[in-house]
Design a protein with these regions (language model features):
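Conserved beta-strand element within WD40/beta-propeller blades
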Residues: 16-19, 59-62, 102-105, 142-146
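Conserved loop/turn motif of beta-propeller repeat scaffolds
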Residues: 13, 55-56, 98-99, 139-141
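A short beta-strand motif characteristic of beta-propeller blades
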Residues: 1, 33-39, 77-82, 120-126, ...
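Internal alpha-helical scaffold/solenoid segments in large eukaryotic proteins
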Residues: 80-90, 103, 110-113, 120, ...
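Terminal intrinsically disordered, low-complexity extensions flanking WD-repeat/beta-propeller proteins
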Residues: 130-133, 147-203
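Loop/turn residues immediately N-terminal
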Residues: 22-25, 65-68, 108-111, 148-151
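Short loop/turn segments that connect beta-strands within beta-propeller blades
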Residues: 29-32, 73-76, 116-119, 156
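Canonical WD40 repeat/beta-propeller blade segments in eukaryotic WD-repeat proteins
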Residues: 3-10, 41-51, 87-94, 130-136
Length: 203
């Protein structure tokens, strides 16, 4: 029995998985007994891995210390574990439905490739300049989300395009500041004109 706080959860057709702030991972089936597995550090992200049967057969967990752990479902047996840079794992995606390779993005902007057929089981592909909040791959491109901003990289780490929302927000702020300055200037001019009209006439 654990009294930890739920920090992550994932709903599946046959039950749901919760991750607690004390590192506990719990599989809670719709019927049957619960299964628990305790990690050394709390989970930061969960990813369900569908197998050839069409069902979710394992769960990948990225924790707050840069570890990526894969557990079987429903028994929560340890299948793989990999330690990256020590930064919080923020996002994980599967390279393809037919591959067990994973793309992993962390709090420091590192992009990792993880898999049993990867040298040393993990490889640093490149480093993004900001915290990675979302990562996915499609059409030989890696798409990274950092907050509101989106970036497209090739697999060599060369940026192909980007849409930086921060620049847009900054531009909007400048436009608002300029509009406000013009309004204040206009108001000041009108006030001076009104003051002149209020002066007594000298004959």
């Amino acid at each position: 029995m654990t009294n930890g706080t739920v920090v992550r959860s994932m709903v599946l057709p046959d039950g749901y998985i919760i991750a607690l702030d004390d590192g506990m991972i719990s599989w809670r089936p719709s019927s049957g007994r619960r299964t628990n597995y305790r990690l050394q550090y709390p989970a930061a992200v969960l990813l369900g891995m569908m197998g050839p049967t069409g069902y979710c057969e394992s769960v990948v967990i990225g924790d707050t210390r840069g570890n990526v752990i894969r557990l079987s479902l429903p028994r929560l047996e340890l299948l793989d574990a990999c330690e990256t840079s020590g930064s919080v794992i923020r996002s994980i995606c599967r390279v393809s439905n037919s591959s067990d390779r994973l793309l992993v993005g962390d709090d420091s902007g590192h992009v990792w490739l993880i898999g049993r057929d990867v040298p040393n089981n993990f490889l640093l592909l490149f480093k993004h300049d900001e915290c990675i909040t979302s990562i996915r791959t499609q059409d030989n491109e890696i798409t990274i989300q950092s907050g509101w901003s989106k970036y497209h990289y090739d697999w060599e780490g060369v940026m192909k395009s980007n849409f930086d929302r921060n620049e847009l927000f900054h531009q909007k702020q400048i436009e608002r500041t300029n509009r406000r300055a013009k309004l204040l200037e206009r108001k000041g001019s009108n006030s001076a004109l009104v003051a002149m009209l209020d002066l007594p006439m000298i004959s």
